[in-house]
Structure formats: structure tokens, C-alpha cells
């Protein structure tokens, strides 16, 4: 690969003299050149295993694991050495004594209230982040000065310093073969942490860039700052000055930061009224342009206009939302309801934050989920991008309401005990130039990699340069902003695989060979960024959750950064959904139980997974949901209970329940469901879109901007006269089963049977025994089930219950007594009836009392009772249904009579003689 870098820019440092470097500052990177030449320079990457040459446009690739250094350079100069080298700084340093701010006041830093020092930083330093209204041209090395007024800054929260990074080798000895790469990666991470501590006052201060950049309000006026080193001139324009580019001209400092201070009006009112449209007018190498400020907090699209407009958002105190409820603690097992605000209405329209708060959140709580993951929060000008082509990273989407509406939604979720996770996009950015970050200052390599490396050819988007100091500030501050300002409880990071590899995971098959993860294709800069953002999240917000969307299976992904890992709490177990689609394209006879079990349990030791049978990806136009794969067009005509069912419907409903339960039961430590899929939402998602004319002349047909398939028909799941209702109630029972037993996070997991002949899978998780019979016709009487603990077992969940659209072939009052003797590598066993296409969960009943699971927090609903005791009843779900006639079923598909089980007699009857495999999974 060939990378060219046009120049270099140092981070903003209040303790530095002005730089006299004679080079272009349009590109920014952590990878600094080592020798300063007046005419040209080359620099060596300190992150990746290749060397970059900005003149020859060539790269030297190391055949070994060594980092190549050109002959005329060495790698002995650190970032700190370069920043402190007097040879590359100006001699005309100014200090901060008697410093007069642009608001006319004098300030000093009160060291008693502001130390900006983290663990491991013995000196500490005052940073630009603390000098909110300081002209960055007047910077000095002093940490305290004397003047007329004091600036009180809150003491920073403590983020633990880096550790040794060596524990990963104890956890996974296979990593030893790649120690050089991993130690190099950890060394880069430690170096950046140290430099952030030294020059920016620590990760806490560094991640509060929104207090310095963009619009900041003080008692005397408004300061606006923007990093745009490529711009030749800049001015702030908007409604407040009639869009006059000559009215409020900005000044540029030595580091490419443009600034202007607007004093209050004579009557004390702010110079820019709340709600005013604003943009930055720049003369750039690409021409004159008006851009939305990169740090804008709100943007809207005016009627009849295509580009968005930035909005100065600073409502009066009485209009600002005040959070009333504490954020919930992180649950042991996280059960996520993936959602999208705009398409959350049953009606064909764009829904609002307020409607979602009032209508959808109570539904999520009633279903038994404990977290809601919200997509498309960051502003995106193209609605059909599903929120993944972000244009304004700090602005919540105005399609759905105001920032205060979003805060109200999150506060209501917290009142209900729900975590709120944000689907955050830091993997790429919209390529829009008018209302996005692309070509912001007129240069190709501003926030992004220059040249082809900065473009994602499949997504048609721009790729961030994670080696840039200001990009790190921007993205880390962005994550901090959503947690701090809006009280989100964590993130699902989108497109992490694309970030971690220069090939972006495209046209690459990951086989599990470790060289695929720790080679030349690994983007170490991006991996280090993820380590930093996880440090930030877990250090400042210990209860927050970070989930990464990685399809590659990167080792160390969910191990702590102090141990050498990347630091996520969970990875998405993405292979499971693909496996189900693969199987649904086959005949039932071709399903292999061992294949299913292997896919579900193929997880890395000590690295937690959030598993799902399907997410929004499977619901998009061009794909199918599980329900549609299973039942197809029959869903249009045979889902009403007053109509006879069909074999396709019977099969589909049965397998839909089994697939979801075995996915939750065996696939991970967390579970995710996309809204509506709990009841088998029919059809696909298709956002409103018009006809598109591509540059190559091709035309992509639209859907006449229809919202018909961009909504969620929750009414289908609620209608007790439709078969969707039974599927929804089963999903609800699954969530409450996990809530009661916590089996997903239990350390005890044992797979005792995966029988290809019987099509039976049996496993233990916690004190539960799961029995799945995937056979399409065969039901088994007196089927022996191995177990660990002795005693009496009872049914606590039965997919064949009529409440869930089943045939009621099991006796829920039956008791199952264990008998001694090894079977399937278990010391005991009990006998059950295993009907075809059913999943049944048994719990040890002895000595355990049953208590109803109350749905509280303002959700009116009857409790769900899980039978965990001797005298308890099986699961009872509250439903709002009328009495319905018995459902006639196909004889070929089911057996209509219930076989009564003799559970006290130890007899082995009709089991087929097949090879039994047993397996322990950790």
C-alpha cells in the first residue's frame, strides 16, 4: 500500500513556544518526522509495520515483524522530545502573567482546584482545555500565574494508568508467537497516554474538547473555535449577522485553530440568539465554502433545502431538561432491544423521541429487556443510510425532535430501569462536503486519511486518520459528550472490523489463524484509538457498557487494556445470525446439531459476547428476517387464528422459537433483538428513497419515498387473534426466564448431547437443563436426559405451550426425578417426553420457592410466574386475549396427542442407538 503525508501538525499545547516549522500543517498525525529539513522531509510511522515516504509515494513493507526505519532517520526521538526540542520552537515565548482575555478580564489558574494530573503523572500541566477563553496565540510553559481573577476548574476524574500489558499472554498462550506485534501495540498506547497526560493534562481533560472547540458561552459573550489548518481565511456567518462574511472575521493561531470572540449585546443578551442558523465561511484550497461547524450541537434541514444548517443551540435555563432519575447499574446479563426512533411507529411516518418515550419504552420494559440500543442518533443528512453516514457527530438527529426531547427519553428509560446504549459511528463518516466533515478545510486529509486510504469503496464514505492528534481529540470528546451530556449508558461501536484492518474486512475470510490479526494489514493506530476510548469510558463511567461490532474474532478484543487487551465489555457474536440464514436455506434433513453447537459456543475464553439470532442487518431490504425465511408468503394469509394453519406456518413458528431460545441459551453472555423481530415482524425494512442517478450513468430505482416498510407493526404482536402474539409472548418468557435464573452469565455450561440421528441437543446452563428436539416428525417418549444435580425437576419454559402458539403436548404439572448412574458423561439422569420441534427448559425444583416476576416501574402488567418450586405453576404470561377455538394442525407435521410421562420409573425404551458426543465449554 502507498501512503503519502503532506505535512505535520503538533497538538495544541499551552506550554509550548510557537513553532517555526516550515512545512504544511494540513495533515495531522502521531507519526512525526525525526529530522527537520527546510526543503523536504520524510517520516516513519510509529504505529504500523511499514514506512511512509511523503516524497516518493512509496512504502517499504517489512517481511519480518520489525518496523523499518529509513537510513537517514532513527526512532529514538519521541513525541515529547520533538515537542520540547528548542531547535524547533520559537524564541519569542510569551508567558501568561497579566494575561488579558478577549472578554477583557484577567485570569489565572488556581492550582488548588485544578491540577490536571493523573496517576503516574508526577508533574501535571495546565492545558488548553482549561483556558476556555484564552487566545491560543498567548501560551507559555508556566503552570500558574498571578492576575486579578481565578478560573476554578473541577478536579479531573482519575483514569487508571496503563498497566504492564502482559496478562494477555497468560490468558492466551497462543499470543506468545505474536508478542512483538502486541508489545509494539501496547507501547504505542502507553506512549500516547503519557503524551496526553503531559501535554493535555490527561485523558479526562483531553476528552473535553467540546468545552474549547465549537461554541462556548461565558458570562461576557460567545467564543467560537474551529480547527481548520488548510483554510486561508475564515469568518463566522449566520442569521445573527445576516450571513455577512466580512462582519465576524476569525483569526488563526500557529496550530491551525481559528477563533473569534463575540461580546454580549449592550443589554446583556447573547450575541447569537438561541436557534440561529450558523456556518463557518472559509477560503480554502478547494475554493470558497460555507460549512457547518464540526463541533455543532444541533443541525436542521430547512424545508426545500438539501444541505443541513448548523444551529446555535443554547436554550434558556427554564427550557433545558433536568435529569431526575439515576442511571441504572450495569446488569449481570445484558438483554438489548435494538431500535430506531424514526421507524418505531406503527404508522408510515418518522416517529419522534417523545412518542418513543411514551409508547415504545414501556413496551420494552414489559417484554423483559433491560437495555435499549438506539440507532441513528448522530445527525445524518441521508435518512436511508440507517444513521451510518454521520454528518454532524455531536448533534442528535433533528428528525426526531430536540436535544431536550432525547434527554427526556433517556431519563424515562432510566426511570424504568433500562440502560440506554447508543449505536455510535466512529468507523467512518459521510462524504458530504456541504454539511459533513469531508474536505472541511478544503483539503483531502483533514480529519481523514488522504488519498485512497481515506475512502471506503463499499460504503462510499470517508475513513478517519486515527493517528492524528486532533482526530483523537475529536472522537474521544465525541464519546465523552454523549455520556456526559445525554447520560447514555454506553455504546455499540459500529464497523469495528473496518477500523482494525486496512482491508476493512472486505473480500477477506478470517480462518482464525492469528497471523490474520497481527500482521501488516492491522491498523494499529485504529486499535490504539479503541484502547483509548475504552480507557475513557470505563475510567470516567465505570458502569458504562462498550460493545464492539467485530466479525473477525480479533483476540484480546474484550480483555482489559491494562492487561494488553482492547478493552471492550462485549463483542457482537455475528457468526450466529449468518449460520441461521445458512441453515434456513437448506432442508431440515441437512441441519447438523454439531454445527449449530460449534457456532454458538465458538467464543474466546474470558471474552464476553452479545449474541443474536437476527439484528437490523437481516431485516434490511434485500435480505429476510428469520420469520420471512421460515414462512415466506404464507405470513400474508395464515397468521390469523380463525384460519387453518399450514405446515409452513407450523414449522416456521416452532423453529422461530427454538432458534431464538438456543441462541440465548448457548450463544453468549448477552442477548440482542431488533425491534419487532420478537414477534416475527413480516417483510423487510425499506427506508423512503427516490431514484438515484449515479455518476457512471446508472440509475438506482427508489420506492417513491414510501414509508410503508419503514415502520414497526407492533399491533400485530399485540393482537391476541393473530399467531404473532404467541411468538411475542414466548420471547417475553425467554427474557423473564433469564431475569430469574441468570443462566447466561453462569460459569456452569455443559453440553451433554448433540445427537445427529435424533436431532436432539441437550445442555446445562446454571441449574437449568435445556432439551431441544429439532426433528421434524419424531417425538421421543422416556428420553433420557443427563444432568449434574440430583433431585426433582420441573418444566419452567415450554415452546409447545398453547400460549406460545404450540400444541400443548407436555404436562406442565409433571415432576421429573433423577436417578443415579452415569449417562452422557453426567452422573445422573431423568426421563422426559421430547415432542418434535420443541424446546423445553427444566429447573431443579427442590427447596426453591416460586415468586412472581413483577413488571414495575410504571408498566401496568400482570406478573409472570416461573415455576421454580415444588408447588409452583408453569410460566404464566399476562395476555389480553379472547378465548379462541382449538387450532387444527397438519397430521404430517405434529402429533396431536400428549404422551403422559412416567417420571418415577427408570426405564429406557425407544431411544435410538446412536453415537453420543459430550462436550464441556468454558
Swiss-Prot record:
| Superkingdom of source | Eukaryota
Q: Which EC number(s) are documented for this chain?
A: 2.4.1.18
Instruction: State which pathway it belongs to.
Output: Glycan biosynthesis; starch biosynthesis
One GO CC annotation: amyloplast
Q: Which GO terms describe its biological process?
A: embryo development ending in seed dormancy; starch biosynthetic process
Please name every pair of cysteines joined by a disulfide bond in this record: none
Q: In which tissues is it expressed?
A: Expressed in roots, leaves, stipules, pods and flowers.
Q: Where is this region: Disordered?
A: 83-130, 870-922
Give the principal location in a single coarse category: plastid
Q: What happens when the gene is disrupted?
A: Wrinkled seeds.
- List GO molecular-function terms, semicolon-separated: 1,4-alpha-glucan branching enzyme activity; cation binding; hydrolase activity, hydrolyzing O-glycosyl compounds
Position of the signal peptide: none
Q: What is the reaction catalyzed?
A: Transfers a segment of a (1->4)-alpha-D-glucan chain to a primary hydroxy group in a similar glucan chain
Basic and acidic residues bias locations: 99-109
* Transferase in keyword set: yes
Q: Where is the active site?
A: 494 (nucleophile), 549 (proton donor)
Uppermost EC category? transferase
Q: Low complexity composition bias: which ranges?
A: 897-922
Any one Pfam family match given in the protein's UniProt record, by short name: Alpha-amylase_C
**Additional remarks:** The wrinkled seeds phenotype (rr) studied by Mendel in 1866 is probably caused by an 800 bp insertion in the SBEI gene, leading to the loss of the last 61 amino acids of the protein and a complete absence of activity.
Which PANTHER family does the annotation name? 1,4-ALPHA-GLUCAN-BRANCHING ENZYME (PTHR43651:SF3)
Its assembly, as annotated, is: Monomer.
What is this protein's function? Answer: Catalyzes the formation of the alpha-1,6-glucosidic linkages in starch by scission of a 1,4-alpha-linked oligosaccharide from growing alpha-1,4-glucan chains and the subsequent attachment of the oligosaccharide to the alpha-1,6 position. May preferentially transfer short chains during branching. Responsible for the synthesis of about 75% of the amylopectin found in the starch granules of mature embryos.
Q: Which family does it belong to?
A: Belongs to the glycosyl hydrolase 13 family. GlgB subfamily.
Q: What is this protein called?
A: 1,4-alpha-glucan-branching enzyme 1, chloroplastic/amyloplastic
Its source organism is: Pisum sativum (Garden pea)
Coding gene?
SBEI
Amino acid at each position: 500500500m502507498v501512503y503519502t503525508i503532506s505535512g505535520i501538525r503538533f497538538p495544541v499545547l499551552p506550554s509550548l513556544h510557537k513553532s517555526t516549522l516550515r512545512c504544511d500543517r494540513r495533515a495531522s498525525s502521531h507519526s512525526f518526522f525525526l529530522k527537520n529539513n527546510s526543503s523536504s522531509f520524510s517520516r516513519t510511522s510509529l504505529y504500523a509495520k511499514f514506512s511512509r515516504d511523503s516524497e516518493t509515494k512509496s512504502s517499504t513493507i517489512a517481511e519480518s515483524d520489525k518496523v523499518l526505519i529509513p537510513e537517514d532517520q532513527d526512532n529514538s526521538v519521541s513525541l515529547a522530545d520533538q515537542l520540547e526540542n528548542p531547535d524547533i520552537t520559537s524564541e519569542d515565548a510569551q508567558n501568561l502573567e497579566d494575561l488579558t482575555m478577549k472578554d477583557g478580564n484577567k485570569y489565572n489558574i488556581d492550582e488548588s482546584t485544578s491540577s490536571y494530573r493523573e496517576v503516574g503523572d508526577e508533574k501535571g500541566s495546565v492545558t488548553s482545555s482549561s483556558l476556555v477563553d484564552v487566545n491560543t496565540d498567548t501560551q507559555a510553559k508556566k503552570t500558574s500565574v498571578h492576575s486579578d481573577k481565578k478560573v476554578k476548574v473541577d478536579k479531573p476524574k482519575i483514569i487508571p494508568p496503563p498497566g504492564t500489558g502482559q496478562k494477555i499472554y497468560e490468558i492466551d498462550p497462543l499470543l506468545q508467537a505474536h508478542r512483538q506485534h502486541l508489545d509494539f501495540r501496547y507501547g504505542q498506547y502507553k506512549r500516547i497516554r503519557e503524551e496526553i497526560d503531559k501535554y493535555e493534562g490527561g485523558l479526562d481533560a483531553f476528552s473535553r474538547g467540546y468545552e474549547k472547540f465549537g461554541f462556548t458561552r461565558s458570562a461576557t459573550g460567545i467564543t467560537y473555535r474551529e480547527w481548520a489548518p488548510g483554510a486561508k481565511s475564515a469568518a463566522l456567518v449566520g442569521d445573527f449577522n445576516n450571513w455577512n462574511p466580512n462582519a465576524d472575521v476569525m483569526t488563526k493561531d500557529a496550530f491551525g485553530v481559528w477563533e473569534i470572540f463575540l461580546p454580549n449585546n449592550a443589554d446583556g443578551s447573547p450575541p447569537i440568539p438561541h436557534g440561529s442558523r450558523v456556518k463557518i465561511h472559509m477560503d480554502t484550497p478547494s475554493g470558497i465554502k460555507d460549512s457547518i461547524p464540526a463541533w455543532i450541537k444541533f443541525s436542521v434541514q430547512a424545508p426545500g433545502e438539501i444541505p443541513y444548517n448548523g444551529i446555535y443551540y443554547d436554550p434558556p435555563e427554564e427550557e433545558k431538561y433536568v435529569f431526575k432519575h439515576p442511571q441504572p447499574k450495569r446488569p449481570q446479563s445484558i438483554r438489548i432491544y435494538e431500535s430506531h426512533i424514526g421507524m418505531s411507529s406503527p404508522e408510515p411516518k418518522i416517529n419522534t423521541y417523545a412518542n418513543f418515550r411514551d409508547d415504545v419504552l414501556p413496551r420494552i420494559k414489559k417484554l423483559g429487556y433491560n437495555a435499549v440500543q438506539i440507532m441513528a442518533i448522530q445527525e445524518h443528512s441521508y435518512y436511508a443510510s440507517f444513521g451510518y453516514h454521520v454528518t454532524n457527530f455531536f448533534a442528535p438527529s433533528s428528525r426526531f425532535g430536540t436535544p431536550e426531547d432525547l434527554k427526556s427519553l433517556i431519563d424515562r428509560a432510566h426511570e424504568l430501569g433500562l440502560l440506554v446504549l447508543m449505536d455510535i459511528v466512529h468507523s467512518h463518516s459521510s462524504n458530504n462536503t456541504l454539511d459533513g466533515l469531508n474536505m472541511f478545510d478544503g483539503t483531502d486529509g483533514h480529519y481523514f486519511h488522504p488519498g485512497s486510504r481515506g475512502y471506503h469503496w463499499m460504503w462510499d464514505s470517508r475513513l478517519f486518520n486515527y493517528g492524528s492528534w486532533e482526530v483523537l481529540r475529536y472522537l474521544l470528546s465525541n464519546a465523552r459528550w454523549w455520556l456526559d451530556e445525554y447520560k447514555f449508558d454506553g455504546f455499540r461501536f459500529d464497523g469495528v472490523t473496518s477500523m482494525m484492518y486496512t482491508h476493512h474486512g472486505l473480500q477477506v475470510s478470517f480462518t482464525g489463524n492469528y497471523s490474520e490479526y497481527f500482521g501488516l494489514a492491522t491498523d494499529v493506530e485504529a486499535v490504539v484509538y479503541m484502547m483509548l476510548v475504552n480507557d475513557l469510558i470505563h475510567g470516567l463511567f465505570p458502569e458504562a457498557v462498550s460493545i464492539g461490532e467485530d466479525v473477525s474474532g480479533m483476540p484480546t478484543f474484550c480483555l482489559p487494556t491494562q492487561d494488553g487487551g482492547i478493552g471492550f465489555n462485549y463483542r457482537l457474536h455475528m457468526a450466529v445470525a449468518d449460520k441461521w440464514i445458512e441453515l434456513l436455506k437448506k432442508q431440515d434433513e441437512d441441519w447438523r446439531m454439531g454445527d449449530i453447537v460449534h457456532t454458538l459456543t465458538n467464543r474466546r475464553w474470558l471474552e464476553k459476547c452479545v449474541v443474536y439470532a437476527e439484528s437490523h442487518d437481516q431485516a434490511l431490504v434485500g435480505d429476510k428476517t428469520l420469520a420471512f425465511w421460515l414462512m415466506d408468503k404464507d405470513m400474508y394469509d395464515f397468521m390469523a387464528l380463525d384460519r387453518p394453519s399450514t405446515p409452513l406456518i407450523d414449522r416456521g413458528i416452532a423453529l422461530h422459537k427454538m432458534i431464538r431460545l438456543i441462541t440465548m441459551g448457548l450463544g453468549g453472555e448477552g442477548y440482542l433483538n431488533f425491534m419487532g423481530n420478537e414477534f416475527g415482524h413480516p417483510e423487510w425494512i425499506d427506508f423512503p428513497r427516490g431514484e438515484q442517478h449515479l455518476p457512471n450513468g446508472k440509475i438506482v430505482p427508489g420506492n417513491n419515498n414510501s414509508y410503508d416498510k419503514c415502520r414497526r407493526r407492533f399491533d400485530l404482536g399485540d393482537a391476541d387473534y393473530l399467531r404473532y402474539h404467541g411468538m411475542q409472548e414466548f420471547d417475553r418468557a425467554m427474557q423473564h426466564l433469564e431475569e430469574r435464573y441468570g443462566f447466561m452469565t453462569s460459569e456452569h455450561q455443559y453440553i451433554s448431547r448433540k445427537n445427529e440421528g435424533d436431532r436432539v441437543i441437550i445442555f446445562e446452563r446454571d441449574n437449568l437443563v435445556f432439551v431441544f428436539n429439532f426433528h421434524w416428525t419424531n417425538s421421543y417418549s422416556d428420553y433420557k436426559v443427563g444432568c449434574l444435580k440430583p433431585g426433582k425437576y420441573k418444566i419452567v419454559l415450554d415452546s409447545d405451550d398453547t400460549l406460545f402458539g404450540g400444541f400443548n403436548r407436555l404436562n406442565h404439572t409433571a415432576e421429573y426425578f433423577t436417578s443415579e448412574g452415569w449417562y452422557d458423561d453426567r452422573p445422573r439422569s431423568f426421563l422426559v417426553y421430547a415432542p418434535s420441534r420443541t424446546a423445553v427448559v427444566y429447573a431443579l425444583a427442590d427447596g426453591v420457592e416460586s415468586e412472581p416476576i413483577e413488571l414495575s416501574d410504571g408498566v401496568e402488567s400482570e406478573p409472570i410466574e416461573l415455576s421454580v418450586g415444588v408447588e409452583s405453576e408453569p410460566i404464566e404470561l399476562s395476555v389480553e386475549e379472547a378465548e379462541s377455538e382449538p387450532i387444527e394442525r397438519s397430521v404430517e407435521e405434529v402429533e396431536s396427542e400428549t404422551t403422559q410421562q412416567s417420571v418415577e420409573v427408570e426405564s429406557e425404551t425407544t431411544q435410538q442407538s446412536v453415537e453420543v458426543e459430550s462436550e464441556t465449554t468454558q
